[in-house]
Design a protein with these regions (language model features):
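Conserved histidines in hydrophobic membrane contexts and catalytic metal-binding motifs
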Residues: 1-198
């Protein structure tokens, strides 16, 4: 009886949180395959440079013709013109897309406001031209919904209390799994006993 009570209570109390975690897991894992195409049909999503290019295979990376130093210098100048106050906090190069990304944040603040991440400026790895930007909590309603997926999934959108809630939700999922199996085994045993001839 206690297994059934735990299973039912946790399932009822946390179904909303469990739904959010499940939905955001789907959106993060199947972003380019399902989530982005569906969102683009429902509402206006501003494409990033990664959404407008086809990635190369792992065997055929795009080698950059621009150096990190050159791209970071361009990004600093562009960020100053845009009124960014944070310094360059990091940079990366995606060899599958031929794109540099430069992030702007203070040390230790790489998750930005509400966990949505810092602003990024993107540049072409071949000729260094500016390709676009990603600004946290800016854009269309669909852009903001897309940006909110990781903060919702990780609980960062609510700060430390949200992260604690998501951690506890993981324990609840484990409890639901265990109690679900125990309930199933008891029902199965009862069915088997009923079928046995007297």
């Amino acid at each position: 009886r206690i297994n059934f009570d735990i299973h039912r209570a946790f399932g009822l109390w946390l179904w909303g949180v469990l739904f959010v975690v499940a939905f955001t897991a789907f959106s993060l894992n199947l972003y380019s395959e399902v989530f982005y195409p569906v969102m683009s049909k429902i509402s206006k999503v501003s494409p990033t440079p990664f959404d407008t290019r086809v990635p190369t295979s792992h065997d055929n990376p795009i080698l950059p013709k621009q150096t990190y130093e050159t791209i970071i210098a361009k990004a600093r100048a562009d960020a100053k013109a845009r009124g960014f106050t944070a310094p360059v906090g990091g940079a990366f190069y995606s060899a599958h897309y031929g794109i540099y990304g430069v992030a702007f944040h203070k040390v230790g603040d790489d998750h930005g406001a509400g966990g949505v991440g810092p602003p990024y400026l993107y540049y072409d790895g071949a000729d260094g031209r500016y390709l676009g930007e990603r600004l946290p909590w800016k854009g269309t309603a669909a852009d903001i919904f897309v940006q909110a997926q990781f903060p919702l999934h990780s609980g960062r959108i609510l700060g430390v209390p949200g992260r604690i809630l998501i951690s506890l939700t993981g324990l609840v999922v484990a409890a639901l799994s265990v109690t679900g199996v125990v309930i199933w085994l008891k029902k199965r045993r009862a069915r088997v006993l009923r079928k046995k001839p007297a």
